[in-house]
Swiss-Prot record:
Pfam families: Ribosomal_S4, S4
Gene Ontology molecular function terms on file: rRNA binding; structural constituent of ribosome
Biased composition (Basic residues): 1-12
Protein name: Small ribosomal subunit protein uS4
Family: Belongs to the universal ribosomal protein uS4 family.
Source organism per UniProt: Methylorubrum extorquens (strain PA1)
Domain S4 RNA-binding, residue spans: 94-155
Biological classification of the source: Bacteria, Pseudomonadati, Pseudomonadota, Alphaproteobacteria, Hyphomicrobiales
Gene Ontology biological-process entries: ribosomal small subunit biogenesis; translation
UniProt cross-references to SMART domains, sorted A to Z: Ribosomal_S4, S4
Gene Ontology CC annotations of this record: small ribosomal subunit
Assembly and interaction partners: Part of the 30S ribosomal subunit. Contacts protein S5. The interaction surface between S4 and S5 is involved in control of translational fidelity.
Length: 205
């Protein structure tokens, strides 16, 4: 088992939830956390603990974004008009690697980050290899022609269990996607409940 898979399993067990909706998640078999003390009964969690847990879950879902980068998303979310929690989700879903994942070009958020890093994606006809690049509504994302027959792409295109959300239009024949709008929390197909307002509260302490 790779270190990346081990890290995913550990986070799933710590949260007690199948964060990415994976069939092989350990929480599908048991409902306690990792380690020798994982089976102990847990008491009521403090407000701080609840907020921290919400932050760890949301940050981990997007490929474990660094704390420094996640704080920048928080700062931008509270600067923008409107609900800060909704703004945070919008910023995360505008990440290029998130759009690549949502478009079913690859199977996981982790694979999407690597796919972008390796230069397989164009935005509006220009190669972009920065996973955190902020996609705007109307932008066209394209898998480079030379990359379309890679096994990682072919396998992902056959995943019937994951639908493309309504805010992205995908042409799987041309391997292109267009973001039609920035989504709100209820539009994003998370396998588990995300609580961005608790994340905002965590950083606002």
């Amino acid at each position: 088992m790779s270190k990346r898979v081990q890290a995913k399993h550990k986070l799933d067990r710590r949260m007690g939830q199948n964060i990415w909706g994976r069939p092989k998640s350990p929480v599908n078999r048991r409902e306690y956390g990792p380690g020798q003390h994982g089976q102990r009964r847990k008491g009521k969690m403090s407000d701080f603990g609840t907020q921290l847990r919400a932050k760890q879950k949301l940050k981990g879902y997007y490929g474990n974004i660094t704390e420094k980068q996640f704080r920048r998303y928080y700062a931008e979310a509270i600067r923008l008009r409107g609900d800060s929690g909704e703004n945070l989700i919008g910023l995360l879903e505008r990440r290029l690697d998130a759009v690549v994942y949502r478009s079913k070009f690859v199977a996981t958020p982790f694979a999407a980050r690597q796919f972008v890093n390796h230069g397989h994606i164009k935005v509006n006809g220009r190669r972009v290899n920065i996973p955190s690049y902020q996609v705007k509504a109307g932008d066209v994302i394209e898998v480079k022609e030379a990359s379309r027959q890679l096994e990682i792409v072919v396998v992902a295109s056959q995943l019937a269990e994951r639908d493309v959300p309504d805010y992205i239009e995908v042409d799987h024949h041309k391997m292109t996607a267009r973001v039609t709008r920035i989504p709100g929390l209820t539009e994003v197909p998370y396998p588990v409940q995300m609580e961005p307002n608790l994340v905002i509260e965590f950083y606002s302490r």
